[in-house]
Design a protein with these regions (language model features):
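Core of compact, soluble alpha-helical bundle domains
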Residues: 1-81, 87-91, 96-101, 108-140
Length: 140
């Protein structure tokens, strides 16, 4: 049983993802993020945690879309778009990179092997794209 709050947005994303059950992965990632970065709760409160949960389901929606399309670029464009949105709201690119790294760590053995390998590749690409963005834009 999960402790995650399933907002209507999360319920819709889960329906869009389909048969792929990523809830246990999202739960581990969100718990780890809030443990490693306690300031998130202080700065963004319960609404911020809801958004973090939603964002992590969105990450999987775009990973799954890229997988179905066999198109890495789909996830790379999502990662860069997400970065522009979250940075404008006070987040740091490093936290998005960290989030993607935690997804990689926590999905090990949780998905079909072919899907997991594809998702790992897309996440690696997203992490690299964000690091290059940071370097090219001179962000610390």
């Amino acid at each position: 049983m999960t402790n995650l709050l399933f907002t209507p947005t999360v319920q819709k994303i889960k329906a869009d993802i389909g048969d792929l059950d990523v809830t246990p992965i999202v739960e581990k990632v969100v718990i780890t993020m809030y443990k490693d970065y306690p300031y998130l709760e202080e700065k963004f409160g319960d609404k911020g945690k809801e958004r973090t949960i939603e964002d992590n389901f969105y990450h999987f929606l775009y990973l799954n879309t890229a997988y179905k399309l066999k198109d890495t670029q789909t996830f790379l464009e999502y990662a860069l778009w997400l970065n522009s949105i979250l940075v404008s709201r006070g987040m740091k690119t490093d936290l998005i990179i960290y989030n993607f790294e935690k997804i990689k760590e926590n999905m090990s053995g949780m998905l079909d092997k072919e899907i997991e390998e594809s998702f790992l590749s897309y996440l690696d690409g997203g992490i690299q794209a964000l690091k290059e963005y940071k370097q090219n834009s001179g962000i610390e």
